[in-house]
Swiss-Prot record:
Main location: membrane
Key word Transmembrane present: yes
Positions in coiled-coil regions: none
Stated name of the protein: ATP synthase subunit a
Compartments where found: Cell inner membrane
Source taxon at top rank: Bacteria
Length: 251
């Protein structure tokens, strides 16, 4: 067992190396791409749906609900990115149950790459939702004096995302390796199950933090509140019309 998949070298020529991080990441991407294509190949748009499709829809609805609870009003817009992020990290961590497999999330290069994806996605969604000018103005809040700190915060939280995931996965691997040396029979099984649990939790935390960062970049309290009030008024009018009652709406 290696502390990091970077230590596992499959092929080397000069300064070019194919280590475990690269190989396992490619295999995971291939597996997820083929698996997604296979799973969604026979989905139906009609009323008759298989149990498998019902299960998939429940999972998607649950993820969308989780995204909307964080503060994103249109979860379908962000589901492809956030869902892919969660699935990749979760599968990468949970596959540690297979012998000979080294999770690529145990490498700092992988976690940094994932954090950079979030770093790029935050301003992308923020600018698309609010426009370039309004998004840039958010860095001047609450006072323009905090502009350098707001910019620095973008980089520090990206670094924190990468280091948090890397540290938790690497520490779990180290503890499991130590326990295999000290007690090579019973205790490593317990630690292996705990390591899988930690891997799933870390995937959830990573994706939730990414959701929070995107929600903060796309939020506009005043505009959202106004939209919510308008929607509430329309719903109330519709309810009154359906009930045949006359309602008086206060401004």
């Amino acid at each position: 067992m290696h502390i990091s998949p970077d230590q596992l070298i499959f092929w080397e020529y000069g300064f070019v190396k194919l280590n475990g991080t690269i190989i396992y990441t490619w295999l995971l991407m291939l597996l997820l791409a083929v698996g997604s294509k296979t799973i969604t190949k026979r989905l139906s748009r009609g009323e008759e749906r298989s149990r498998w499709q019902n299960l998939l829809e429940v999972i998607i609805i649950t993820i969308q609900k989780q995204i909307s609870e964080v503060g994103l009003r249109q979860p379908r817009t962000y589901l492809p990115f956030l869902g892919t992020l969660f699935v990749f990290v979760a599968v990468a961590n949970l596959f540690a149950v297979f012998p000979g497999y080294e999770p690529p999330t145990g490498s700092l290069s992988t976690t940094v790459a994932l954090a950079i994806c979030v770093f790029v996605a935050v301003p992308f969604y923020g600018i698309r939702e609010q426009g370039l000018r309004r998004y840039l103005q958010s860095y001047l809040k609450p006072v323009p004096l905090l502009l350098p700190f707001n910019i620095l915060g973008e980089f520090t939280r990206t670094l924190a995302l990468a280091v948090r995931l890397f540290g938790n996965m690497m520490s779990g691997t180290m503890i499991l390796a130590i326990m295999l040396i000290i007690t090579p029979f019973i205790f490593p099984v317990v630690m292996g199950v705990l390591h899988l649990l930690i891997g799933g939790v870390q995937a959830y935390i990573f994706s939730i933090l990414a959701t929070v960062y995107i929600a903060a970049a796309t939020s506009d309290n005043g505009e959202n509140a106004g939209a919510s009030d308008d929607e509430g008024g329309e719903d109330a009018k519709s309810a009154c019309a359906a009930g045949g009652k006359i309602c008086k709406h206060k401004p």
